Amino acid sequence: MDLPRPEITDLNRPYWDALDQGHLVFQRCGCGHAWLPARHECPSCLRPGATWERASGRGTLLSWVVYHTAYHPAFADRLPYHVALVQLAEGPRLLTRIVDGHERLVGDAPVDLQVSREGEVPLATFRLAATAL
């Protein structure tokens, strides 16, 4: 079974287009606040008109969980899988998958972006940085 596909809209298209080219982007407001996922207004000051910025691809592993139960049939053959909260070096946080090094995960470990693909869909996943190995 295929994984659920994201809904690509005019609002989030820059995010998906950037991933398709191998890098990650996030939105930043004139007030300085940065975030993911995409939205029309700043979650901090509610000002519209954010700009897109390219992320360095570096981040910090804040927390993670290991799923041993498939809550969607498409995940049944992937068990167990790791879902993590990563804070990008630029500030935004995102829920993502950790694709390797599971036995060496520790809080505050440095991680690097790895764009993975599920069929034609690019996904922002992360792996432990070489400095963490």
Give the location of each predicted region.
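The −1 position to Zn-ligating cysteines in a subset of zinc-ribbon hairpins
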Residues: 25-30, 41
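Cys/His-coordinated zinc-binding microdomains
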Residues: 30-33, 46
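Short functional micro-motifs and their immediate structural scaffolds
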Residues: 36-37, 49-51
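Conserved hydrophobic positions within beta-strands
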Residues: 59-62, 98
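Short, conserved beta-turn/loop elements at beta-strand boundaries and strand-helix junctions
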Residues: 64-69, 118-119
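Beta-strand/loop nucleic-acid-binding surfaces
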Residues: 92-102
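Short nucleic-acid-contacting surface segments enriched for D/E, G, S/T with interspersed K/R
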Residues: 100-112
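OB-fold/S1-family single-stranded nucleic acid-binding modules
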Residues: 114-133
